[in-house]
Amino acid sequence: MKKVMKIIGIVLLCIVALVVVLIVINTIKTAINNKRVWIPDDYYTAFESDSALEKKYAGLGEYEVKELEFDSENKSIDKIRVWYPNEAEDRQYPVIVIVNASNTAALNLKPAYARLASWGFVVVGNDDRQTGAGETASETLDYVLNLNKDENSELFGKIDEEHIGCVGYSQGGAGAINAVTKFENSDKFTALFTGSASYALLSKNMGWEYDVSKISIPYFMTAGTGSSDDAGNSEIHSNEVFAGVAPLASLVENYDGITADVFKLRARVTGAEHQDMLHLTDGYMTAWMLYHLQGDTEAASIFVGENADILTNNGWQDVEKNK
């Protein structure tokens, strides 16, 4: 009997040791994965659209881009990363602050930030992987605006502080809404875009509660029609059922919660799952920012009027807008 118990003990010990080893290996793998870039430099070349304008704005702009990084005293932020047009010309560029999705850092998506900067933006991100509260986005904006005033900074005088956009995905969508509504510097933002922002109850339960009624700047909200974004039950006010990350019902509710004097637009990418939203919204997200931050009239034609490009694009559905 003692021998049997000894064998059982050894087996259990081996199982525990194996579990520990697997946990360590998985932790190491995660750490390594978190420090690498997840998408190829030319990821945007795979994008297809029936809309010539969407295809155009999903690609590269005309500017060569330079990248900078700065250490942050905030451990959640870790590093602040900036991409901007590398030109000798003495001019200013609008800013776009990007708010990360869950467990994602700017480090992981460098090519996406660089592509956006090639359209004439100073694109700013950080390596915070839990961004829903919006606080680190707010802090990151303050940091880069201080660089604009620092004569020793490469960004000195390069930032147009009158035109600042905010872009957020998933948890970062909630974070973007909070960034433009909750903080002392929230009034500096002048345009907002979200890709599959987590619905209000989900955000509240996770500690990222937001209030869309406080949004006072042009807002383009998007989501996918796939089951990861919309589980098909519309139960956005129940804790008993998961409705998906960003179901249509939540877009409708958020859209209706914003006052009519604010330019607002909601739309869904046909067939898109939650994880597809960054690259499948690139074109129209870029155009939205070009329109509102640079006054680009061609980009505006995608969104404004009865003949707006988004209304006839088969890749988009459930479009509602008030301009």
Model feature map: region roles:
Residues 2, 29, 33, 270-323:
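Alpha/beta-hydrolase-fold serine-hydrolase catalytic core, especially in secreted/extracellular enzymes
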Residues 90-101:
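Short beta-strand element of the alpha/beta-hydrolase
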Residues 190-277:
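The feature captures the conserved acid-bearing segment of alpha/beta-hydrolase catalytic domains
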Residues 175-179, 203:
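Hydrolases whose catalytic domains are alpha/beta-hydrolase-1, hotdog thioesterase
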Residues 1-20:
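N-terminal Sec-pathway targeting helices
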Residues 107-126:
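Short amphipathic alpha-helix adjacent to the substrate-entry channel of hydrolases
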Residues 87-92, 135-174, 182-183:
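Gly/Ser-rich "nucleophile elbow"/oxyanion-hole loop immediately N-terminal to the catalytic nucleophile
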Residues 35-91:
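N-terminal cap/lid segment of alpha/beta-hydrolase-fold proteins
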